[in-house]
Amino acid sequence: MSYNLTDPYEIARYIKEAKKSTPIKAYIEGDLSNCDFTNIEKFNSGDLYILFGESEEILVIIEKNKDKIKNCRIEQDRRKSAIPLLDMLKINARIEPGATIRDKVIIGENAVIMMGAVINIGAEIGEGTMVDMNAVVGARGKLGKNVHLGAGAVVAGVLEPPSSDPCTIEDNVLIGANAVILEGIKIGKGSVVAAGSIVTTDVPENVVVAGAPAKIIKEVDVKTKDKTKLLDDLRK
């Protein structure tokens, strides 16, 4: 079944209808030689087993063979999850440990995703853009090229409350730490959002905004550009 992931209601339907998954990893010492491992990925040497699969299937095996099991350890990182995480193996970007990126996200060349960042379904991260520590890009949030999304900043998504228009951050924008960009807002090219600001209306190109709610305080000048310039070495 196909879904139009540009529509927040379609995204919600996709999540609703997705098969929920509770994958686990089990390390087992014991005799499981007579077990049926259909639908379970198994690695073993003698009586040592590593099993990957859905919790209900692996737990049935453990329960049925508990008298033959000497030791068992289970690792679990989600429950009834609707959307898998993004396969990052073929992405040409720097993605640090602890970043959480859901499937159906686009990551541009030489982007940087730092520890603790969260990027939701349908988001787009442009070439050379940095999503700093603990920043959040909500569903369908769009960040252009060479954007800096500061630590703890939030680009709101379209899901709840539902919004037909995603947040759009155009090229060469700098968003300071802990700033919040509300649903459907557009930040024009080259603009700067000061740390801690709450942006409730669209921002034109090449201006500096600050405050809660954010207001234009000046145009971007040479001094501003010097203070907010990005470091190319961080993107290589």
Swiss-Prot record:
<comment type="function">
    <text>Catalyzes the transfer of an acetyl group from acetyl-CoA to tetrahydrodipicolinate.</text>
</comment>
<dbReference type="InterPro" id="IPR050179">
    <property type="entry name" value="Trans_hexapeptide_repeat"/>
</dbReference>
<dbReference type="InterPro" id="IPR013710">
    <property type="entry name" value="DapH_N"/>
</dbReference>
<keyword id="KW-0457">Lysine biosynthesis</keyword>
<dbReference type="InterPro" id="IPR011004">
    <property type="entry name" value="Trimer_LpxA-like_sf"/>
</dbReference>
<dbReference type="GO" id="GO:0009089">
    <property type="term" value="P:lysine biosynthetic process via diaminopimelate"/>
</dbReference>
<dbReference type="InterPro" id="IPR019873">
    <property type="entry name" value="DapH"/>
</dbReference>
<dbReference type="GO" id="GO:0047200">
    <property type="term" value="F:tetrahydrodipicolinate N-acetyltransferase activity"/>
</dbReference>
<dbReference type="InterPro" id="IPR001451">
    <property type="entry name" value="Hexapep"/>
</dbReference>
<keyword id="KW-0220">Diaminopimelate biosynthesis</keyword>
<comment type="pathway">
    <text>Amino-acid biosynthesis; L-lysine biosynthesis via DAP pathway; LL-2,6-diaminopimelate from (S)-tetrahydrodipicolinate (acetylase route): step 1/3.</text>
</comment>
<keyword id="KW-0028">Amino-acid biosynthesis</keyword>
<keyword id="KW-0808">Transferase</keyword>
<dbReference type="Pfam" id="PF14602">
    <property type="entry name" value="Hexapep_2"/>
</dbReference>
<dbReference type="Pfam" id="PF08503">
    <property type="entry name" value="DapH_N"/>
</dbReference>
<protein>
    <recommendedName>
        <fullName>2,3,4,5-tetrahydropyridine-2,6-dicarboxylate N-acetyltransferase</fullName>
        <ecNumber>2.3.1.89</ecNumber>
    </recommendedName>
</protein>
<keyword id="KW-0677">Repeat</keyword>
<dbReference type="InterPro" id="IPR018357">
    <property type="entry name" value="Hexapep_transf_CS"/>
</dbReference>
<comment type="similarity">
    <text>Belongs to the transferase hexapeptide repeat family. DapH subfamily.</text>
</comment>
<keyword id="KW-0012">Acyltransferase</keyword>
<dbReference type="GO" id="GO:0019877">
    <property type="term" value="P:diaminopimelate biosynthetic process"/>
</dbReference>
